[in-house]
Amino acid sequence: MPYPLQLGFQDATSPIMEELLHFHDHTLMIVFLISSLVLYIITLMLTTKLTHTSTMDAQEVETVWTILPAVILILIALPSLRILYMMDEINNPLLTIKAMGHQWYWSYEYTDYEDLNFDSYMVPTSDLKPGELRLLEVDNRLVLPMELSIRMLISSEDVLHSWAVPSLGLKTDAIPGRLNQATLMATRPGLYYGQCSEICGSNHSFMPIVLELVPLKHFEDWSTSML
């Protein structure tokens, strides 16, 4: 989860988020090297008194600054496309959850169970218990088993919303009349917080998401108690 004065990403809790962090570091290193080179050239141009008079026709330089950017773009595009296809690939999910956005709460349905669904509202500040987080706690958490492939079906009943959990690398738009899907697999148990990430009205900031990832045995016990 985030903490005050945080400058980086949240700790990765899914394979997708780990890949996104690696891609971020890869791209940032390329940007850093380019920025350093440009800054070095600008510094040389500002500090030298020498003038090169033969740069009006420099075929070699033009060739280099045409090919080099293309190579750099390829080095960025290939890992990006790989991750993009990984995020869209859903193979044999063991559990399917349908998340519906409303103004201003989420409702969840476990489609593999006959009658397991509930609404998830934010807990008002006045009702918070010691240790709970303001604007992030909900009355009904989405309980899921860890280390299993889970398919999320996401849509909306009214306006545009966005179902986002940063530590899992998830952000999927909830669009009325359209069913979007995402894959989810957590590698560690715990509570994972997210929020609606699409401005959806006056209470947009009061639509938290709380995932409770538990071992499979605990999930089976919980689902049995809910039916």
UniProtKB/Swiss-Prot annotation:
It is found in: Mitochondrion inner membrane. Its EC number is 7.1.1.9. InterPro entries: CcO_II, CcO_II-like_C, CcO_II_C, Copper_CuA, Cupredoxin, Cyt_c_oxidase_su2, Cyt_c_oxidase_su2_TM_dom, Cyt_c_oxidase_su2_TM_sf. Pfam families: COX2, COX2_TM. Cu cation A2 binds at residues 196, 198, 200, 204. Cu cation A1 binds at residues 161, 196, 200, 207. Mg(2+) binds at residue 198. It catalyses: 4 Fe(II)-[cytochrome c] + O2 + 8 H(+)(in) = 4 Fe(III)-[cytochrome c] + 2 H2O + 4 H(+)(out). Residues 1-14, 88-227 are mitochondrial intermembrane. Residues 46-59 are mitochondrial matrix. Binds a dinuclear copper A center per subunit. It is a multi-pass membrane protein. Its cofactor is Cu cation. One of its GO terms (molecular function) is copper ion binding. Its main location: mitochondrion. The chain crosses the membrane at residues 15-45, 60-87. Keywords: Copper, Electron transport, Magnesium, Membrane, Metal-binding, Mitochondrion, Mitochondrion inner membrane, Respiratory chain, Translocase, Transmembrane, Transmembrane helix, Transport. Component of the cytochrome c oxidase (complex IV, CIV), a multisubunit enzyme composed of 14 subunits. The complex is composed of a catalytic core of 3 subunits MT-CO1, MT-CO2 and MT-CO3, encoded in the mitochondrial DNA, and 11 supernumerary subunits COX4I, COX5A, COX5B, COX6A, COX6B, COX6C, COX7A, COX7B, COX7C, COX8 and NDUFA4, which are encoded in the nuclear genome. Component of the cytochrome c oxidase, the last enzyme in the mitochondrial electron transport chain which drives oxidative phosphorylation. The respiratory chain contains 3 multisubunit complexes succinate dehydrogenase (complex II, CII), ubiquinol-cytochrome c oxidoreductase (cytochrome b-c1 complex, complex III, CIII) and cytochrome c oxidase (complex IV, CIV), that cooperate to transfer electrons derived from NADH and succinate to molecular oxygen, creating an electrochemical gradient over the inner membrane that drives transmembrane transport and the ATP synthase. Belongs to the cytochrome c oxidase subunit 2 family. NCBIfam families: CoxB (TIGR02866). This is Cytochrome c oxidase subunit 2. It comes from Dasypus novemcinctus. The lineage of its organism: Eukaryota, Metazoa, Chordata, Craniata, Vertebrata.
